[in-house]
Amino acid sequence: MSVKETLDMRGLRPQKKWGQHFLTDPRILESIADAAEVTPSDIILEIGPGLGHLTRVLAQRAGRVVAVEVDGDLAAKLRDEFAASNVTIVRGDVLRFKPIELLELGAGTSPAPLPFKVVANLPYYITSAILRHILEAVPKPRVVVVMVQREVAQRMTTQPPAMNLLAISVQFFAQARVMRTIAAGAFYPRPKVDSAIVRLDVFERPPLSVEDTARFFEIVRAGFGERRKQLHNSLARGLGCAPEVVATALARARIDATRRAETLTLPEWGALCDALESVTHFSRDESNAELHKTPNLDN
């Protein structure tokens, strides 16, 4: 039975507001499970199970599957279908749950069994937000396999001199690689662009040692805040720093002030973050010292 026939039989329609495009080729479903190297010992968190086609493949291979679906109609159908299985269906927005909370719902116990893997066919419009949510979570998955727009896959895996905020956000936490591309014709309804399967092998520890991850990404966002601008300009404006402070930090990090954000490597961003923190702390300490200096009563 085709995807369209399945939807018609269940009285369902693809919801544009949730960016729903359903895979029609069973071989691709197997490719996704292969990319995640799913085994009977695995706990899988699936995001956006849709009609449950990938869920069935995962359930045949994994020890346990927890699938979170935002569409209430689809979630209800899935609950009926997988009632007596190793699959738990959670109705809700994945961004409103910590991954550990979803796993605990699936396990029926606390704490949830760990480690785990994430498998998802992500809606194009919310890909970045979901990836950030998963990769910044504690605990983190060991592996993330996602179907995304091909252009997004290319942005995630790019290297200097074509870096971008998404690439840094992903590569800070994981090694990313494109496993295969998928033609638009493999989906119903057919999207306007091709897709790709991307595998993220999540680091146990980030390759960069930064004291404050939030501050690190604040600096990176500032660097990319004005496209095609030189770093000394975009950082000064984005961080609200004096130009001389930014210039000093760039010099300490041994980064040419005229370079652009997309040319920096991850280690260079780490060095720049450390340098900016050092310079700004020094500036604050110096200002505080001036404020608290004992006044000269002889004048």
Cite the ranges covered by each PLM segment:
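Catalytic cores of RNA-modifying enzymes
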Residues: M1-A222, T248-R252, E262, A271, ...
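Active-site-proximal catalytic alpha-helix in oxidoreductases
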Residues: G225-R228
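Short helix-coil junctions and helix-kink-helix linkers
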Residues: A236-G238
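Non-catalytic DNA-recognition/assembly elements of restriction-modification systems
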Residues: D274
